[in-house]
Amino acid sequence: IVNLVFFSPEDLNIIKNGPGERRRFMDLELCQLDQIYLTDLAGYNHIVNQRNRLLKDLYMNPSLKETLDIWDMQMLQYGTKIIKKRKDFVRDLNQVIQDIHHNLTGGIEHLEVVYEPSTEAEDFENVLKKNRERDIRMKMTSAGPHRDDLSFVVNGIYIRKYGSQGQQRTAALSLKLSEIYLVKE
């Protein structure tokens, strides 16, 4: 297996666009670094899709509601592992990216990547139970790793909304350079 890190203008989208871009970045990195993560992520995504299909089918067949517990237990099994691995990844990423960003900006800026899970691993089961009726009404799963996000904070400012284009570009470059380091390790 050859691990590659590619830098392109589209990498700015990780910083600027919605949470899906940032989850995709995180998942791609973790899949390169951890084969088990890839298996867990594939399993989790399959379970979420099945659960969402069930939530849509409940309208026509309310007796299926009993089977939600089965899907929830499987979501918990995969989801808690994903949340923990993402948390560890962001911790490791911060150890690298802060030095890189500090050097790129001549020490003027401090960059921090903040992992924003939709639920903590230890609360996931309670959140699924609490959100169940809402999920049924909305016909979709409202909490779990598929709703997580990352924020990029420079000197206390969330740069997705409030940072300059220069800050966003420097953060994207810092992120890609950090990838190189993490993949090499």
Question: At which residue positions do the language-model features occur?
Answer:
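Short charge-dense sequence patches
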Residues: I1, E21-M26, A42-R51, L76-T80, ...
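Nucleotide-state sensing region of NTPase/ATPase domains
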Residues: I1-E21, F25-Y37, N94-D99, V127-E133
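Conserved NTPase motor "head" modules and their coupling/switch loops across ABC/AAA+ ATPases, GTPases
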Residues: Y59-E185
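Long, charged N-terminal accessory/stalk domains
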Residues: N13-I14, G20-E66, M73
